[in-house]
């Protein structure tokens, strides 16, 4: 049985899981002391983390791990491969207790261009700072082998471990090997390939490894055309295959880029409740190894520039960062010793800034969801403020009233009014109206009658008036409501309209005279609220209309039977619920309710219907 603290922790964790994004990323589990005890990657963060808490685990590591979780952090990335690389970096950095299978410091391989007179190129898992160049790491090994194979086919490179110094080559210490005879090596060991020619190939290879393949591709196209002009189609086809390999090759990752080292990245987002969120990423040796988002509560209406400056100072102090470059989203009036501030517009640094912005926006959205779950009224007020801003109202529309008509060719004409208070339906305030003064199908006249009756009475009884009236219809409905509200009753109540598309779905919000379309995203919470209001008034009106029509039909069927009074009708409808069921019932079943004589009368009367 869970203790009270455990129950609170479980509720807190469920809240985090419920708001996780369905995006690739890395998640971190922390214990009660704030220590990271597990790091994992996911193609879909929400599904992966949810799986830990949605079932009973068998006794063992996973069950123990779940029991130790007190908090969850996560970092959003753009691809599953990025998540793999980031997971690897974080596991090596924090060495979490429950990542036992990944604690051997095994890392993803990189491609090394060795710092030698005639450089060798090979894959390695060790980064040695001896002037060599490293590209990667590669989490997808087939991609790495494809690149190495491409290089092998494009350029004849040495693969031996010989010390090919100028002195040793001049001394004639070496002989060509099999690689030379099968044309996989040009024989630099015996002076058959010059140092300059070899390094020219190395420079081109480095461009391929960096992903800068445009010049290489252009060179291959020219070579391919040359061979084709010389009628050497077989060789041209081989060059074409190499060209296609290069074009399809993508060697860089957004999360890990070997050209970036010791850089801090910051971004900031604000909300409407005096909060600001700052995201911090730290890049070391081409990889993200720190990621953190935190919240500031404004006290003196500080600007984004002031808050971001505070965040930079605090994070660099907390994580002991000595980065010489800081990437930020906008210019800052901040000077730090030996530090350059960069506002990137393109390239790898811009991708890192975009990744930071992605994380801070996601964090902001998650905090908003959590706050609104704990305090639903906060969500309601946010939506009402959105309506206020979109329609330029003087105040949030705390009380919204919406009208709709319902009839079939003018028969059984009714109308309905639903009331939403603080963005929630207030069903005790709903009202139904039988149309009294309109003959035939006239929606505009019916709307005028109902609006007039409702607000004349509100004025007479000194009842609260709505902050916004919404009509279930377009410009015509809005205009007839305006005529009653402004011209007849001399009231000042904003009027909006909800128009539907040809599939009878809410499509747009109209406001103003003449009416203008207010652009609202159909996936937004505000649009869903407006759709809810329109669906609710339609449901309420049509249900009332059906009930009225049904009662009229029932009344006419039983009223036409002589000798059957109100008491008998009530007894029959109470038992059988409808005229149709009375018709289907046997004589004996009806007789049990009203006696045999009346039962025969009813049976005979309904059979003539």
Curated annotation (Swiss-Prot):
Where found in the cell? Cytoplasm
Looking up PROSITE patterns in the UniProt record yields:
GIY_YIG, UVRC
Record CDD domains? GIY-YIG_UvrC_Cho
Alphabetized UniProt keyword annotations? Cytoplasm, DNA damage, DNA excision, DNA repair, Excision nuclease, SOS response
Q: What is its main location?
A: cytoplasm
Which GO biological process categories is it annotated with? Answer: DNA damage response; nucleotide-excision repair; SOS response
UVR domain residues are: 214-249
**Gene3D superfamilies registered for this protein in UniProt:** 5' to 3' exonuclease, C-terminal subdomain, GIY-YIG endonuclease, UvrC, RNAse H endonuclease domain
Any one Gene Ontology molecular-function term assigned to this protein's record = excinuclease ABC activity
Q: Name one Pfam family in it.
A: UvrC_RNaseH_dom
Q: Indicate the family of this protein.
A: Belongs to the UvrC family.
Q: What's the stated role of this polypeptide? A: The UvrABC repair system catalyzes the recognition and processing of DNA lesions. UvrC both incises the 5' and 3' sides of the lesion. The N-terminal half is responsible for the 3' incision and the C-terminal half is responsible for the 5' incision.
Q: How does it assemble?
A: Interacts with UvrB in an incision complex.
Q: What is this protein called?
A: UvrABC system protein C
Name its species: Bacteroides thetaiotaomicron (strain ATCC 29148 / DSM 2079 / JCM 5827 / CCUG 10774 / NCTC 10582 / VPI-5482 / E50)
Question: What lineage does the source organism belong to?
Answer: Bacteria, Pseudomonadati, Bacteroidota, Bacteroidia, Bacteroidales
